[in-house]
Amino acid sequence: MTVYSTPRGAATALTACRRLSAMGRLELQLAPLLLNSNKRRRLSLNSTVNAIAREFLENKQILALQRKLENRSKTMSNWLTPWWLDYAYLMSRTPLPIVTSPGVTFPKFNFTGLQGQLECAAKMIHAVLKYHHNILESKLKEDKAGGVPLDMSQYQLIYGTTRIPKHGKDEIRYGKDAGKWAQHIIVVRNGHSFHVPVYDTTGVPLSVPQIQSQLHKIIAESESVNAFPINICSSDDRDKWAQVYDRIKKNNCQSISSVENALFVVALDRTDGRSSPSTADNMGQAIHGGGPPLAMLLDYVCDQFDQEAFNTTSNASAFDSPSKLNFQLTNDDRNAIIEASNRIDKAAANLEIVSLGFDHYGKNVPKAAGLSPDSFIQLAMQLAYYKLHNSFACTYETGTLRKFAEGRTDTIRLPNEDSAEFVQMTSSRRPDFSKLAKYLREAVHEHKDYSKMVMNGNGIDRHLLGLKILAKLDEPNSTLRLLSSPAYNRLLQFQLSTSQVPTRHVLPMGYGPAEVDGYGCCYNPQETRIFFSITAFKSSSISSALRFSKELQNSLHLMRDIIDQTSMGKTKPKL
């Protein structure tokens, strides 16, 4: 059981040295590297690890690396983000679907038949284009957390962003850097890809009827299934995809350019999932800006449907018709398509997904007891895991750094000593509810305090990552005892990978586990209900998304009982 966070003094020192970026956002500076001394800021309960930590902090190489990292933070608006993109995403060679690229389900829209599908798709495209212009015209309401404004630059990265496969490290291209925004999208149907203009010749977005007419035009050319859809190779291992990409680019430059420059991709396929997937490189990934900005877009699309806020008046200006992308492929390319298709089918079949709508209560219950809803839900997941596996789960929770310019994420960790005490006490045969209430409150406050530290730039995970990267850059063959120790490596093996992505509409979002025997758990706490998307790998003999979902419900019920049957349910302490 391990927790590593910065000391109380570090937050003050950090605040004092922050600068404002050119956009008026706080610049992410570096916290002092200090040894935690009290219980709340302990490094570990393990004396061996503490000894290694003391040695680590007194190491001359570490102190030199810390100075270099501090200098980097003084010369950049965000010392972390460029490295984070490279090491967490672009250098990763694993396939994008399942773990890196999240999936999301829209509410069921009421339509029937092909015509209804095309009208619904046209409205969705129209709404997404409207949101694009809201971003360009700075019409979005500023995001805030606890009254603090958040960096909005990530919204600029949603449209036209493409990850180009390269050997060893991919390349990221942003639509905003193209000089001129694209005016087309890619539509995929039955494995066929189409370049579809969505603006008229004067640069005005097409109306819903005009977009629908564009979609109608591709139907006749996509009735049969394309046996060799090259898009599917983008779902493969990144080096394998890079090898195919290098081959096909020679004879398909125009088609590839059309895909890479598109604003976004739309798939008009069957619900059984047997049609070929759209291009993974051009889909909404965490690399585009994270869950919350994408969630805001999805909420906006749903709002447009609720309000029927669509432009149905067509302009008189002409617009270009869709054009089919015909790829010239070799036998090697066709074999690569078959192999990639088999691999993604196998990976998809191995993923267990449980969508849980917990409608007994939502944020209202923990809030009424003066408890943080997020911390409350995190403890419920800790309890569920412990009851299933009789062990504590090394847990990753996404902590936003959007308070800072170009901010991405850091890690909010569990378990800690307080959460462990609560979980163990709750799992005892005859739990004392009055004691459980005390443990629950302490565990919630401990998690909430560390969450605030992380979001204020005082998290330890990215700090250690920075030191590790610098060490490798300075001396590629060097090893730092702590950063190569089994204890540190275990810290990076997350049995629970969690993230809160709040939306107003019911938009379940999910992703796969970080470990073969772990769980992915994306959750959306609303006022009177909580939605979870829980995943596990079917090949694991240890994890089960279904069993976890049942134990999670039991934990949530038990935690409400603790509130209702003690003074927690009668008083409302200040959050």
Model-derived regions, located:
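Long, Pro/Ser/Thr-rich low-complexity/intrinsically disordered regulatory tracts in eukaryotic proteins
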Residues: 1-575
